[in-house]
Structures are given as structure tokens and as C-alpha cells.
Amino acid sequence: MKGLNAKPFSHEAVRQKLLSGRESLQRRYHQNRNGAALLRDHSRLVDGILRQVWHEMNMPGSTALLAVGGYGRRQLFPYSDIDLVVLLPDKGDAAEAMDNELGTRLEHWVGLLWDIGLDIGHSVRTVKECGEEAANDITVQTSLLEARLLGGNSDLFDRFLQVMETMLAPRKFFVDKQLEQQQRHKRYQDAPYKLEPNIKESPGGLRDLQNVLWISRAAGFGKTWSELAKKGFIIRREARLIQRQQTVLQDLRIRLHYLGGRREDRLLFDYQNPLAEELGIAAKPPRRPGEMLMQRYYRAARSVTQVNTILLLTLHAEIFPDEEAVTTIINERFQKRGDLLEICEEDIFERDPGAILESVLLLQQNPDLKGRSFATLRAMWRSAPLITASFRREPRHCAMFMEILRQPRGLTRELRLMNRYGILGRYIPAFGRIIGQMQHDLFHVYTVDEHILMVVRNLRRFMAPEFAYEYPLCSRLINEFERPELLYLAGLFHDIAKGRQGDHSLLGKVDARRFCERHRMPAEDTELVVWLVENHLHMSATAQKKDIADAEVIADFAASMRDERHLIALYLLTVSDIRGTSPKVWNAWKGKLLEDLFHRTRQYLCGETALTDISLENRKNKVLQLLHPDDAAMRAYERFWSGLDSSYLMMHDPREIAWHTQHLSQRMKSPAPIVKTRAAETGAGVEVLVYTADQKDLFARICSFFDGIDYNIVQAKIHTTREGYALDSFLVLDPFNVANHDPREFQFIEQELTQQLEQQALMATPVKGRLSRHLRHFPITPQVSIEPDDSGAYYVLSITAGDQSGLLSRIAQVLVRFGLNVHSARINTLGERAEDTFLVTGSILSNSRSVIQLEANLIKVLHTSPQPETPGKAPGKPSAGDRIIPR
């Protein structure tokens, strides 16, 4: 008898058999790209080895070895776990049923399998315990549903199947699996999973397809797509479509395993470009191969989501028939069944495709309708190809679409549904081209179509009274705005040309104009929509890169606005756009900048051409209203102000001036540095005031300090008094961007920064921070631009680069080396993209050769990845790939 004392068989030979078998499968897969065959053949290879080892171990005839889970259904991916159950006869429990010799033998068996190279996940259970575990855990029950016999007692396996079949309750199984799916979707909906989705678990992943088949099998409708087609749940064309998308996802998952050399189901940034190259996907500038691969994935996932939703609704209707639902006729095309909208006849959309848009309107106009029946949704999905050029030209259809945009409720929900089922992309072909298109610009975390619909959703949210507390100004403005559907149209088209060669704003306005003209919109409305699409980045760029306290900046911006209606529309679109890129991009400081720009421009447009709130005398008066000084204090304030020129008063608002005056008017010639802090008015961030005898590297020292404590400088205002003192103010954000600050935080900054400025020790060279994986795989080409400003008094230094810790310190130290003085700084971070603007002066700026050297040094410190040395390239000179913007 074989067993522990039998002559051991050569596990090394078995290990080599497994290794060579897997290598052969990998070679064959890369030759024929047949994923289904690989999964099946890999399962077969492992089956043979497990049977051989089970036989050699001479396991008792009363036991059985089962394959379960994905391996059980013969879909074994290259590095997936091999899930097994050792089935024991019912003798109390598994521990009781397993005598000492069997326990030792199983322990030896598990160790042997690991030595051979099989990553197994195993459990030892009796038939009764399998039933109990399955009853308590839907995941266990689902895994055991896939069980098949590998070796051992077939009668025991039959008993196991009977128990599993007896306890399978289709209704409970459906409810549990649906809840499990909802929880999984919620878990994988976070932004990182959108950028790096899990092919198996994310919404639209392989698990969503398996879920449909598990429920179908539990209800007795079949366990394959062809069986579901035979039962009439889907048509054969749809079965082929599902199979095709399943193949796409399986292929990507197989390649991920091989590329990573391990079980890897996430499309990490590290793998996106290599996978694309392996699949022969070429770049189509400005889009990288990885972005095109991800569009292929997102479109497959979208199809899977469609199938999953429709089939689960269909199965629900079969498993939970609602025979008592009251039916009310709405018109000759639609009826209300219960609280769902239902088509009266199955082919209504084929006979009248316009009814697709009518169904959208009916859902919006009837609050008592909670959704569509499975038959309506399925017919809508199947009829999407009927939306053709002639459909789009039909005046009735154009009128209905515009009516959809005008509805006071349900717009966001219906636009998202129209996108999910292919309606929106067919009605607006330009929108169809950006579905599933990723944007690796380091601040968008959504695909272009998701971002666009998020922008529309943000605009709609401003309309809702229950959310008015979030953005009171935006809520008031949009509720007073005539024809808000024009804003929604601008939102739909603002990024619609992303991914094409050329300026997406200019290309998008062409699409927008074509749409408006096809829908016979008035010229005035068309002009506004087209103008918004063309200028949708203008307000954000002005607020974040220019000094909006400068009257000339406001005047120039106001001139580009045309009128107050254009300004209001652009403000609402800009706030919605920035908020729709990523939860991390929007913050209170950006909101305050945009709001200040809006108010100042609005005043200018309304005839206050002197910009009363910005004028010097008016500012002084407002400061005095805040301070209420007596005569002695007034004299001190006047002395303090006499040491400041008009640029200081223009640069700071009255509250800032009052704060500075309070702390500095009695200490104008302080021998020691003065550092004061307070919570920012925006609710996030800390305002820091620094007053000290001026020194050439002061800005760099302050940057170095905040870099050392992981605070981000988002704004700097630099001023030198007539007495030679630096009066600098900063807005900084802590690493966690909290709104409620501990007083000890303020005390720490004041004490530590004062000490650092007093010591004037040599600054350490900033160490390049660790890059995020996103930035490492999708680096931003640094851009540097140095141009004189309109006044001729300063130069504007604009920098774009990938953000990382220490970046501002490195920039500041370069400026010190070249003898430049920083007068103001706008530090704008969009996700992981830094767009910084500095107002500088220095003698070298009039020398073109020196400026080129400055640009080259800045490019060098801005690079986010190690720069390989190029033969023949002189040190300090930018390479051809670097962008120095010509003057």
C-alpha cells in the first residue's frame, strides 16, 4: 500500500512537468492569442498533476478532492490561486472525521503541492459542513457551486451535490448576490480604481459577468451565454457581443499575470504602456498607447455593465414575478406598470426610434415613475443603433432633446443612463468618440465622458435648493440665469474634442456650433454656448496665474467677458469644471480666487470703472473701519503706510493690510524677524506674515522651511519697504488640508520659522521627493516661459512641471543663484501637475544668453525622472524634448 512509508515519487519531475507545461502554454498563447483555450488547458494541466499527487499519496477511498471557484469552472489564470476542497464523510465534523494518519498525510500533501509550484487555497470539510458554510456565506456558496470532482469518492461527491442543490434558494441567492455586487462596486468605485481598475472586481469587470451566470444557474435558466440565448433572455447577437467583451477582459488579465510574473488583476500605470505595446497599439498624438489601451478597457467594461444591469433586471422579473402590479396606459407607446415605465409593444423603438427620447422625457416629467422596466431598458439598448444621421436631423427629435435639457428634474440621471446604453454617444457623435477616453494629465481622475457628465451634474446641483448651502453664490446665480440649459450644453461640449490633435477648446467650439445650428437655436444662444466652450479655461487661468488685485488685469479680463451674462455663465462653468476633475483638485483657496475675480470683474462691467473696492484711498478707509484707531495709533499707522508704495496696497486686500498694520506699525525697525500666523479666511490653510531685514535668499529660505514640514505654499506676496525690510505674506496648506487648525500649529510655525531666519545657516539642497507611480509613468514635460509683463517693470516666469515635494525650494534656489528677486508667486497645483507663476526682476533678464542658462537650469530641476546623459550634450542645456517657450 502506498502512503507515507511508500517509496516517494519524484516531486522534482512533477515540478518540471508543471513548469514546462506552463511555459508551453504561455508560448502557445502568445502565438494564437486564444485566452479561453489557455484557461481551459491550464486547468487541464493542473488537473493531471493534482490527480497524480492524490493517487501517489494513496488518500483514503472515503475522501474526495474537489476543484472549486474559478479553477472549478476551468478558468485558471496563469498565477491565480488553485482553490480546492478535501471532502470528508460526515462523522461529526471534519476534525473528528480526520484521524491522525489522514491529518499527517494531508499536511504532507499540501507541502508537496507547494514544493511542486502550485499556489493552492484549500479547506477540509465534511459534506454537512460545506452546507453550513454555504448557508452562512454567499461567497463560499458561490465557490462551491463551481465544484467538480478531481479524484476520490464519487458517491461522496454526489451526496455533496445533492446537499448543495437542496439548499439553493434562487430568491435568496439573487438578493445576496445583488447585495454582494453593490458592496463590491462601492468598494472599487474610488478614484484610484478608476485610474487603475481591477479587471476582475471593478464595476464592469469579469466578476459582473460571472454574477449573471451564477444567478441564472441558481434559478435553473442555464450557466452559459448560449443557454441564456436559447431561453430567450438574450439574442444570439448579444451573446456574441458578451463573449467578445469577456474575451477582451480575459485577455488583458492573462497578459497582466504574465507581465507582472504574479497574480495581478489591476491595470496599474506600470503595465498600461507595456501592455499597449504588446498588443500592438500605437500612439496617436497627443494620446499615448496606454491611454488608447485604457479606452479599449473602459468600453469593454461599459458593455459589461450594460449586460449586467439588463440581465439582472430580466432575471429579477423572472424570479420575482409581480403579477399584482397595476398597469396604467400613458399613451399608445408607453404604460406605467407599478412604478416603472414600460413599452406597450416590444418593437416600439424599432417602429418609432424617437420614442427612445420620449421615454427619457416621460421619466423626467413623472416623479411617480422610479425607472424603466427590464423590457423597456433592454429594448432601448438594442435600439441604440437606430440613432443615425437622419434621426439626428429630424426636427421632432431635436426639439425633444432640447426639452430634455430644460426639464427641472432628472437630467443628470437620464444623461448618465443615455451614456451607459449608447444613446448619448450616438445622438452626439463627437461625444461617442471620447467615451472611455482616459486623461493622463495628472489631475483628471475620470474618463472624458464621465468628467463631462460630472460637470453637468455640478451645474444641476447648484440648482437644487437642498444643496444651496454648499455654494450659495453659484446657487443664487444659476437660479437667476435665464435658459440654464445653455450652461448644460456648454458643459457637454467643453471637453468634447479632448484627444484630438490641436486646441480642444477651438475644436470643441466647432462641434458646439454645429449642434446648436442643427437644433435651430437662436443666434444669441448659439454664440454664448460656442463662446463658453472656446473660453472655458480662461477664468481659471486668470485667477490662478495673474494678480487679480491689479486693476489692469481686471480691466483686460472684463473686456474679454463681453457682458455680465457671459461672466456669470463662465464663472458657473469654471467652478463646475474644476470640481469635476478630481476630489483633490478643488479647494477653498481656488474657490476664493474665482469668487474674487468674479466680483471684481462684475463691478467693472457694471460701470464701476475706477474699481472702487480696489482703489487705494478706498482700501485705506476700509482698513481704518476694521481697526478703529485712536489718534496715537493713527499716527503710527500713517508712518507705517508711508514706508509702503502703492504696489503693496494693490497687492493686499483691506483685511490683510489691517492684520499687517496691527502687528507691524509699532515694530517697523525690528532687529529680529517677525513671523505671525492666522487661519485663512477661506477656511483651509494658514496665512503667514514674515517681516525682516531683506536678504537675497529670503524667499528660498522660507520655501525650504515649509518644504521641510510638508506644507504647500499656494500663494506668496513679496514686498520690500522703503526702509529695506521684507514684508512677505504666504498662504500655506498643511499636508492634510484641514480646515480646523490647532493653535499649537500656529505657534510652531512662528517659533521655528523665526529661528531659521535668525540663524541664516546655509540651506540644504532640497532632495527630490519620491514620485507617485502616476507621475513616474506619465511624466509631464517641463515648460519654462520668461516674458516681460505689460508694464515693463517685471518679468513673468511661468513654470509647468510634475508636482513633487521640494519642487518650489529647488526653483527658489535656482532663482537665488541667478540673482533674481521674487515679487509675487502663484503656486497652482492641479492634482500632480504644478503650474507656477512668478513675478521677478534681476539684471540678467536683459541678457538673452543668461536667460537661456536660467531656463536650462530650471528645466534640470523640474524633471521628475532621472535624465539619461546624452552623448555630446553639453551640461545645463535642455534636450530637444524639453519645452522652453519662445519669447
Swiss-Prot record:
The keyword Acetylation does not apply. It comes from the Bacteria. Residues 864-887 are annotated as: Disordered. It catalyses: [protein-PII]-L-tyrosine + UTP = [protein-PII]-uridylyl-L-tyrosine + diphosphate; [protein-PII]-uridylyl-L-tyrosine + H2O = [protein-PII]-L-tyrosine + UMP + H(+). Belongs to the GlnD family. Has four distinct domains: an N-terminal nucleotidyltransferase (NT) domain responsible for UTase activity, a central HD domain that encodes UR activity, and two C-terminal ACT domains that seem to have a role in glutamine sensing. SMART domains: HDc (SM00471). This is Bifunctional uridylyltransferase/uridylyl-removing enzyme. Residues 330-686 are annotated as: Uridylyl-removing. Residues 1-329 are annotated as: Uridylyltransferase. Uridylyltransferase (UTase) activity is inhibited by glutamine, while glutamine activates uridylyl-removing (UR) activity. Its EC number is 2.7.7.59, 3.1.4.-. Modifies, by uridylylation and deuridylylation, the PII regulatory proteins (GlnB and homologs), in response to the nitrogen status of the cell that GlnD senses through the glutamine level. Under low glutamine levels, catalyzes the conversion of the PII proteins and UTP to PII-UMP and PPi, while under higher glutamine levels, GlnD hydrolyzes PII-UMP to PII and UMP (deuridylylation). Thus, controls uridylylation state and activity of the PII proteins, and plays an important role in the regulation of nitrogen assimilation and metabolism. GO terms for biological process: regulation of nitrogen utilization. Residues 687-772, 796-871 form the ACT domain. Its cofactor is Mg(2+). Gene3D superfamilies: 3.30.70.260, cca-adding enzyme, domain 2.
